[in-house]
């Protein structure tokens, strides 16, 4: 595995579309085509993570026949490409009849052969739901929908079903005896009686938020948890994928949301046993100072940890105080990010995740009742303890398992959470917090105790994802390039030493982990972040511009909306993604506002605010004087050109640091995408396929002259991927030695040596100003060939960095032969 290229498959870009582009993918040097999920998803799915039938390849993508055409097309090139695919073991989409397992379960209830495939609590403490599954699908209360005739019985082919608008639900066999559909539809009481006999209970969606009795993917009711910890469920849900690996069609897997599983370690061991030689990476988001568990039998993560390290390297930490003061003064927001996080987590657990907390509370009540020192605990105090511990956990989850001692990392995280909870909440009994912490480390044996730990470990990833990624990241806007999946906006930049420490650790422990700068889930593309990071280097100029723009745009504000925090986000977004049109900007701001959940939200939209925001953004975009000022600011500070230099530097690190580089579709040239769905727009492969042969043999000056086309980035990627393909050992060395620079601009250089490979790139490029002055590095002994320019350098002390980069903004050299 030397490199991957991520493709988002959909009905707009199917297997055969990828076949048509196979020559392009092969020609610029990628080794693996890395596809979004390929199994049958819900009708109309545009991403594939809502699988409804894992036993067949997605028909909307072309089915198995088209998939095999793609495999054949990838294999027929001189340099064969392999296929890496995304799998979703954590959940499935309900999607009615489209999901045969779900349909059978709804029809037959607990007696269905698929009843235990889904993570359903058939013994719900709510009597009306016991033995049933609650479905929050109604737009109003059940009685009102029933009485207005929205629920009817109909015949669909040979089946009698319940219809609610465009949704259908099966009738249980035992309720069909003597059933006359027309007669029942005319009699509300009779219809009510029939519905009561089903193995599901139809409910108003708002009420269901407090009564659902199944595990979801985060807070999405239509994505139900799958119990892959059961051998039969694992076998049935993985049979097709494992078959594609066995016959050579697929050469690697990305495991989506591994933290949602009951026991990720056991799952990964079972998967590894089935595919002992297959490349495996997990979508695991690591917190600051967290490491991937050694117990995971995988090659690494999908690369969000690399994003955090690289982004931090290009932020000027010395200006944290200035930008923090500006943010506080301009927006009135003064909470540190850690407090914003805790607040958002608590809000999510009190609202959209309340039903999951309630289930844990019920378990804890039962446990406490059997431990005499805690049997007098009230539901309220137990719930408070659970919420406080979950809110204080700094990682997505722990991995404590029955029969195995908790790792030092897990013990440390639980200890930190418990100590923090005790300090923040002296009103919660310290003995109770200590008891729950011991439960979470499995220091108390028992079935209920193990269940509590497992459920808590499945809850906290949802709390983190919804509370932090999908809420706090949209509330705390100090420098939004840091608001990235896997990042910590509270950490303002990383030192060069921290970056080297990370790379050294990866080289030693996870040399084949995936590296990336952009994904289908990133909030902003790597290029948008690279440009936005430059603001950290010009805080005074940025403040002057923001205050000037705010004063001018006050006339566009609608009834005081939006607030300054959202306005500040807008200015950063416009600078980072410019040129951005009104449609894209408004869509981004609307999503940001609803995710922040301050003035509006997805669940409780406020039309007046949404309209005011749309009108404000539209007026700002139509203001010619403002746009001229914005473009003048961007041009005066050379943010486009400098952002491109930073992008080339980051791309070089992506392609040369320890690990396997992944390129997100369209990112082989400049890509100024925002959060989904903006980052899933179609890629113009016709243009890229035409550009590639034009620049393949061009020199540095020629491609730099075509910078607006993205030529420098595509040229750099093509050259380095070619080198990775023809000389994999050059990039596969486990050695990693930091290379120090000396001189006036030393802090602007990042360099390292990996045996025969030497890399030097610029950082903090606004302050560098394109002038390396007297900055030098010591080039190790030997004859070095530039992989960028083809030039030769001889090893020795005091080699000027300016000389290494006089033709192109980065330097990548390979040693021809070791000195005698």
Predicted feature descriptions by range:
Residues 1-43, 51, 55, 60, ...:
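Carbohydrate-interacting/catalytic domains
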Residues 23, 81, 125-128:
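Activation on extended, non-transmembrane soluble regions of large proteins
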Residues 43-47, 94-95:
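Short glycine-biased active-site loop of nucleotidyltransferases that positions the nucleotide triphosphate
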Residues 70-120:
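Hydrophobic or amphipathic alpha-helical targeting/insertion segments
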Residues 91, 261-262:
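Catalytic P-loop NTPase motifs of RecA-like helicase/translocase cores
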Residues 93, 110-179, 196:
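Long, basic N-terminal domains or extensions that often function
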Residues 254-261, 705:
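Conserved short loop/turn motifs at secondary-structure junctions
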